[in-house]
Curated annotation (Swiss-Prot):
Gene3D superfamilies: P-loop containing nucleotide triphosphate hydrolases, Winged helix-like DNA-binding domain superfamily/Winged helix DNA-binding domain. Keywords: Plasmid. This is Uncharacterized protein MJECS08. The keyword Lyase does not apply.
Length: 1064
């Protein structure tokens, strides 16, 4: 067949070539596809077309006829193939002034292309491309009508109105030579009812009158129709005036008066256009859309509005333009923007640039978010280069970051790393968002030789950043950093806080460990076989690290239960509980009881195995959050090891599929750690956990109530950061398991010792007055209030607290022993929390040991073998827990019967203390599940009496359990006898009671000492040092410094210089 094709070309001047070629195709139908493709290739060769054109002006028409004939002769599959690689793929590149038969080709193919091509939308996109090209060549072939008809049929068969709408609009816009369909034009396109358009314009006019109250007498409804004329691209002012006066039938004076109103509303912009001899032009602004969007919503049909919003909405169009605007100014090193550049732009880009300049100055957060989004889309969403750096033998260093000079060829390149995640570090970085550089070059006389050009750049963490220079885009001078324009309400530079996850990757077949920086990591799986796509970079020391872009798990490791049991027993353990403690909770060895145990850890592990509890949301009462149960809660002052105790739980992942999810890093700033069936979540302070699964632990006193109490109106508005918006309608916000020893919630700068002192006050009114005075002092220190205003706000806060905690009202106030009060005060929480622990305070000597231990653990983390070994073992423990959670286990008959008897006895005991049935049922379920968990941890197939006894022991280690043992020792003794366990007679000198009393006594002594120090400083006002206070009161410097810091937080003293204190 080549000879026929070549013959056609060589003899193209022969007038019979068309007839000759068609006859040959009929003679060899099996090769028609090959002939057609070759003819197509010839047809697209510019040199060939040029040569053919010299011989015969009709050559392209002849080739077009051959093309159409071959299409009609081809079978369906070949036509699809030819169409895919033919006309639509290269249509925009055709010299259309030569192809006289292109219209016929499009028309003939349209009849079947939508039904026979696999993806009709692909054809639509090609038609759009071809249509744009034809429109540019002024080839009016009424493509919109053709496409509209075909898509009407498509709509009838496939119910695909979206494609009809999109393609029809596209070609109609091209055909009408109007490429700027604004939102209002789109509205008019969808609304054909003139009365509806009239009504819409009336409402726009009413909105203008409402916004501009000083013009109440001016009826803007008369001129609102001008917005059907205006576009973003603008039009000459004189042409607009003539057109508007003609359509509105009003005088020029009235129109100009209303234009003045619209300009003050920033709905229009009138300025000179340098491209048109500085003639005045009038433009429609984006603010117009923002102000009337709710009106448009009323008139656009829902589906049409969604389509129009997705395609032509003002802000969407603006964001697309801004994205392109930003992309053009991005470099791999960062983002650069010259403020003065806007004035040099033209057309629509100038409008976008001006908007972006305004956005930078007025809404820098939004502008920076957009820059970062574009940056990551541009540089962090491309296919990884196939550079295998795993097998390089230059990786010999055993440090976290490796100096490998031979890696220079891979620096700043996208690479693929394959290995295991050997550890995770979470922290938050804060840095200024933007920096401003101004071209200022002062001579000796103080005159500026610079051009005052301003350049805004993203902050770059370079050394000596104040001296960091860039080139002026105007005059080429070196310009320095100037004070940032972008400041918050307090005048401080706006900073960008970024949650940063650092994953430690263990490369395969090597012993090397590298840092992987991930700017946003919703989920990382420990020790999964992963592929990390990242850019290899170096820091200023020449050390290599990976700026990770993505982490993709490669496979799931299967768990062998029998092998794990053998491993535990071979290691000398009779159960998995002790094995897990030693492998996972090695960091909390310092927090042990006198027997060298930590029952809290036992509880946490067993609770981790349970899957029974959850939270539900009660939406019927003002949208308030109502937890059904919280499994475990700790109570204690700062620094008592609560976070240190539970942090290792992050290593006990629940499932292999969704092992760990970290929403907020940095343990110091957390309100709690929530364990659910599928994930582990960290929550930032002040935030109510929005999790439908069960929380196990919530800790720390933060600033929630104080922050809300400062501005109750702000709470109503729902704008308070960190407050769940469904709570905004009321003040009675239930705190989920936070600080229940006062039943209040989180209060800033108050620790447990202060609160005990407040609660020792006799009588409700005295307590209330003490709380009001305390908050008033706080508000005076933290805000610019006078005394009366601070007291009024403090009263609102206290009333808010009392309203949210009915157990603190006057009728419930107890004047008996502190333990009675504690039990009564805990009732608000104990109906939902079976396990509550009171952590004892530690002495300075204890903390020295804990800090030393923590330091050793930190050093050990840097040892690769230690990281790998410990994390592998933690991972195996996680898989074991995940496995036994789903493993069913039954009670032995005697154990089940005994458990029922225990429940009956315990129910009577709880009823004496006013705990309702619902709580009792949940508690018994917990004991039952805990007994099963203990049996599973001991690799048993059935639950026996020993497991029931272990579950009871854990429960009676809690505050409520201890108090029940103190109040009713005989009944508790009877309960333990049922499971064959003897307990000592519980007297007032019970060990647990002594610890609680010791805590209370220490709290009283410290509070008394704090008052004495403050009174002494007030009576002898001067500047004191910490050493002076320590010597005067015969206490250690650490204790004195701690008390002085508390007084400083409360606003009683200030701190003029380091380690100096002055009474206020």
């Amino acid at each position: 067949m080549d000879k026929y094709v070549n013959g056609s070309i060589n003899n193209i001047q022969n007038n019979n070539v068309l007839e000759y070629t068609i006859n040959e195709i009929n003679q060899y139908p099996e090769d028609v596809l090959e002939v057609a493709i070759k003819l197509l290739n010839i047809r697209y060769d510019p040199n060939t077309i040029k040569e053919l054109d010299e011989h015969n002006k009709n050559n392209t028409e002849i080739l077009g006829n051959i093309w159409l004939f071959s299409l009609n002769k081809l079978p369906l599959k070949e036509r699809q193939l030819l169409l895919k690689y033919g006309l639509w793929e290269l249509g925009a590149e055709l010299p259309t002034d030569k192809l006289y038969r292109l219209e016929d080709a499009i028309t003939s193919i349209l009849g079947w292309s939508f039904w026979e091509i696999h993806d009709p939308k692909e054809v639509v996109l090609k038609l759009v491309k071809a249509g744009e090209m034809l429109h540019q060549q002024n080839r009016d072939i009424k493509i919109g009508e053709i496409v509209g008809e075909e898509f009407t049929a498509l709509h009838q068969q496939n119910n695909d109105f979206t494609m009809l709408h999109q393609c029809g609009e596209e070609f109609t816009a091209l055909h009408q030579q109007n490429n700027d369909f604004t939102m209002l034009h789109q509205l008019l396109h969808n609304i054909q009812d003139n009365s509806m358009i009239e009504d819409l314009c009336n409402k726009i006019g009413e909105r203008a009158n409402t916004l501009k109250k000083s013009y109440k007498n001016d009826d803007c409804k008369k001129t609102a129709k001008i917005f059907t004329i205006l576009t973003f691209e603008g039009m000459r002012f004189d042409e607009f005036m003539n057109k508007a006066i003609e359509q509105l039938k009003i005088g020029e004076g009235t129109l100009k008066q209303h234009l003045k109103i619209y300009k003050q509303l920033e709905w229009i912009d009138i300025r000179k256009n340098p491209e048109d001899y500085d003639r005045k032009y009038i433009y429609l602004t984006y603010k117009f859309y923002e102000d009337i969007k709710d009106i448009l919503d009323e008139y656009l049909p829902k589906k049409a509005f969604q389509e129009a919003e997705a395609k032509s909405e003002f802000m969407e169009d603006l964001k697309k333009s801004l994205k392109k605007f930003i992309e053009e100014r991005l470099t791999p090193e960062g983002f650069e923007f010259d403020i003065n550049e806007v004035d040099r732009l033209k057309g629509k880009e100038r409008i976008v640039g001006a908007y972006f300049r305004s956005l930078l100055l007025n809404e820098p957060y939004e502008a920076i978010e957009m820059i970062y989004k574009v940056y990551y889309e541009k540089y962090f969403q491309f296919k990884p280069l196939e550079i295998n750096i795993i097998g390089l033998e230059t990786l010999r260093s055993r440090t976290i970051m490796t100096k490998a000079k031979d890696w220079g060829e891979f620096r700043n390149k996208l690479c693929v790393f394959r290995g295991d995640i050997a550890g995770i570090i979470h922290h938050r970085k804060s840095r200024p968002i933007l920096r401003r550089y101004v071209c200022i070059d002062l001579d000796k006389n103080g005159n500026n030789k610079g051009c005052n050009c301003e350049v805004i750049r993203l902050y770059e963490p370079v050394e000596n950043s104040q001296d960091y220079k860039i080139k002026c885009p105007e005059c080429g001078r070196d310009i320095k950093y100037s004070e940032s324009l972008f400041k918050d309400e307090d005048g401080e530079p706006i900073k960008l806080e970024r949650d940063l996850t650092i994953a430690i990757i263990q490369l395969k077949e090597t012993d090397e460990v590298y840092r992987v920086y991930l700017p946003y990591t919703p989920e990382i799986n420990n020790l999964r076989d992963v592929e990390i796509v990242g850019i290899l970079k170096t820091n200023h020391k020449g050390e290599y690290y990976i700026e990770g872009l993505s982490i993709n798990p490669q496979k799931t490791i299967n768990f062998n239960y029998d092998a794990f049991v053998r491993k535990v027993k071979n290691a000398g353990y009779s159960n998995a509980l002790d094995y897990i403690k030693d492998r996972v909770f090695y960091e909390v060895k310092a927090i042990l009881d006198k027997e060298g145990k930590n029952p809290t850890i036992d509880t946490l592990i067993t609770l981790e195995i349970l899957a029974s509890s959850h939270i539900y949301w009660d939406k019927n009462r003002d949208g308030h959050l109502k937890p059904e149960t919280i499994d475990c809660l700790f109570i204690g002052s700062y620094g008592q090891g609560k976070s240190l105790t539970i942090e290792p739980l992050a290593k006990l992942h629940n499932t292999t599929e969704d092992m760990i999810r970290v929403d907020m890093p940095n343990i110091e700033n957390l309100i709690g750690l929530v364990i659910s069936r599928d994930n582990i979540k960290f929550y930032k302070k002040g935030i109510i956990p929005m999790n439908h699964n069960r929380p196990i632990f919530i800790e720390e006193m933060m600033d929630f109530i104080l922050r809300v109490g400062n501005d109750l109106d702000l709470l109503k508005s729902g704008k308070t950061s960190g407050i769940w918006k469904r709570e905004r309608e009321g003040y009675n916000i239930p705190m989920i398991g936070v600080s229940p020893w006062i039943g209040v919630g989180n209060i800033k700068d108050i620790d447990l010792m202060e609160l005990w002192e407040i609660y020792h006050l006799k009588g409700f009114e005295e307590f209330k007055e003490a709380m009001i005075n305390y908050f008033a002092k706080k508000l005076l220190k933290q805000h610019d209030y006078d005394r009366n205003e601070a007291e009024d706000r403090a009263k609102k806060i206290v009333n808010n607290i009392l309203g949210a905690n009915p157990q603190l009202n006057a009728s419930e106030w107890l004047l008996s022993k502190i333990l009675d009060f504690t039990l009564k005060n805990l009732r608000g929480m104990t109906d939902r929390i079976p396990l509550i622990y009171l952590l004892k305070p530690y002495t300075n000597e204890d903390w020295k040991e804990i800090k030393l231990h923590t330091y050793k653990v930190k050093r050990l983390r840097e040892d690769n073998n230690f990281i790998k070994q410990k994390n592998l073992e933690a991972y195996e423990c996680a898989l074991f827990i995940s496995y036994i959670k789903n493993k069913d286990i039954e009670f032995k008959e005697d154990a089940l019967k005994t458990l029922w008897e225990v429940e009956e006895k315990l129910r009577d005991l709880l009823r004496d203390y006013g705990l309702f049935k619902g709580y009792s049922d949940r508690l018994f379920n917990q004991i039952e599940y805990m007994a099963k968990a203990y049996a599973k941890l001991k690799f048993k197939e059935y639950v026996d009496l020993e497991d029931v006894r272990d579950a009871l022991k854990i429960w009676f280690k809690t505050i409520l359990g201890v108090l029940l043992r103190i109040k009713a020792p005989d009944k508790v003794k009877e309960i333990f006898k049922l499971v064959g366990e003897e307990i000592k007679e519980t007297q007032q000198k019970d060990e647990e009671l002594e610890e609680i009393n010791k805590l209370i006594e220490e709290s009283r002594k410290l509070s008394q000492l704090k008052r004495e120090i403050l009174n002494y400083m007030l009576q002898n006002p001067k500047i004191y040092t910490t050493v002076e206070i320590a010597e005067n009161f015969n206490i250690s410097e650490d204790t004195a410094r701690g008390i002085l810091k508390e007084l400083w937080k409360n606003g009683d003293v200030d701190n003029p210089e380091s380690d100096q204190w002055r009474p206020l």
